[in-house]
Each structure stands twice: as C-alpha cells, then as structure tokens.
Design a protein with these regions (language model features):
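Short conserved segment of the HATPase_c
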Residues: 143-157
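Short alpha-helical segment of the dimerization/phosphotransfer core of two-component systems
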Residues: 32-37
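Short acidic helix/loop segment immediately C-terminal to the autophosphorylated histidine
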Residues: 14-21
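Acidic ATP/Mg2+-coordinating residue in the GHKL
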Residues: 138
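Conserved micro-motifs of the catalytic ATP-binding
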Residues: 51-57, 90-93
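Short helix-loop "hinge" at the ATP-lid/N-box region of the Bergerat-fold HATPase_c
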Residues: 109-113
C-alpha cells in the first residue's frame, strides 16, 4: 500500500541521514505518494457525497462549452493541452461535479498520451437528438479489450505502474461514472489499443 511504501522510505532516510542521494530520492517518492493519497481521499469523499440524498446542486449552464473551457484552463500538469469544440448547448448540471468529471477524464487522457509523439486530446460538446453529448477523445495508448468492461470499477488499474507513476489512484473513472449516473446519464467508453479512447456522456439539453 502507499502507506507501507512511505514508511519504508522514511525508515531508509533515517538509516542513511548522511546520504544526500538517498535522502533526495526517498523524499521525492514520499511526496509523490502523499499527493496520490490526497487525490484518493478527495475522490472517496466525493463518492460518499454522491450517496447522500439531494447531493446535486443543479444550475443552468447557458453554454456547455464554458464548462469545457474551464477544464482546459485548469492546471493540468502534463501535455498535450486539450482542444475544445462546442456547439453551445444549454444544460442543467451540478457545475462543480461536472467540471471534476471532465477534468478527471482529461487527466486520464493525458496519461494515455504520455510518451506518444503527436498524440492529441479533444473535448467536445454537440447536439444529438435533444441531448448535449460530451466527449473526451485522445489518440493515446488505448485500453486493451479485456480491461474495457472493468475500467469503471473502483481501484481497477489497466496498467498499475503507469497509473501510479502518473499519480493515478484507480478511482477516477469510477467517480466519473457515478457523477454521470447521478445526473441520469451514462458514461460510455470506446477504445482501441494503440489507437486511442473516447469517453461519451449525454445529458438532456435544456431547450428555450
């Protein structure tokens, strides 16, 4: 577990107080794992909040593209920077949770694109038959077909070493699916290994 590893590195630092390289590496690992635990705690609290009646604070968003732009402007920590395409749909969502969901999906897409030259991410919202359809598409590493049915399970990681190295906790997609479900929507994932992934969430568009 992260705590066991952190304790191990803390013991190593205590055992080698004069070894500057060991101190630097151990401190870096402890910092990284602490960040991962913080992200995990925040995600678990969000999941618990979704279980409470009346947890959603729905507001009318006159332009769903602004939600995508908000995600694009948040500190991402990695590249590529996503491109935004929006038809200006009007939606009623819990703005904070919806942005959290889109940001988690964007961070997942960025992890999938790491080390792949020319990889790209697109955040899109378009109208389809009275629905506002949000998609997060990447041209990253893709998800193996055998893993695809399980990726929204809490703590399930397709590539544990890759996910942990990038700060993942294995709960991001589970949280995204729960946020979508709380809005009466369904999160759907299509992916081809070595080609890329598209995540789709559709909610009713609010018509004038």
């Amino acid at each position: 577990t992260p705590m066991t590893a952190m304790l191990g590195y803390a013991d190593l630092m205590r055992a080698r107080p004069d070894d500057a390289e060991t101190q630097r590496e151990a401190a870096g690992y402890i910092y990284h794992e602490t960040q991962r635990l913080e992200n995990l705690s925040r995600s678990l609290l969000a999941l618990m909040g979704l279980d409470q009646a009346g947890a959603l604070e729905l507001v009318l968003c006159q332009d769903a593209g602004l939600l995508l732009q908000t995600v694009r402007s948040l500190p991402q920590g990695s590249t590529p920077v996503p491109r935004v395409i929006s038809a200006g749909c009007v939606v009623q969502v819990d703005r904070s949770l919806w942005v959290d969901m889109l940001r988690n999906l964007t961070l997942n897409a960025q992890r999938a694109c790491q080390g792949i030259e020319g990889a790209a991410i697109t955040l899109r919202c378009e109208r389809r038959a009275g629905q506002a359809v949000f998609t997060v598409t990447d041209t990253g590493c893709g998800i193996p077909a055998a893993d695809l049915p399980r990726v929204t399970e809490a703590f399930y990681m397709v590539d544990k070493s890759r996910s942990r190295a990038a700060g993942g906790s294995g709960i991001g997609l589970a949280l995204c699916a729960r946020i979508a479900n709380a809005h009466g929507a369904k999160l759907e994932i299509t992916s081809t290994e070595h080609v890329g992934t598209t995540v789709t969430i559709a909610v009713p568009e609010v018509l004038p």
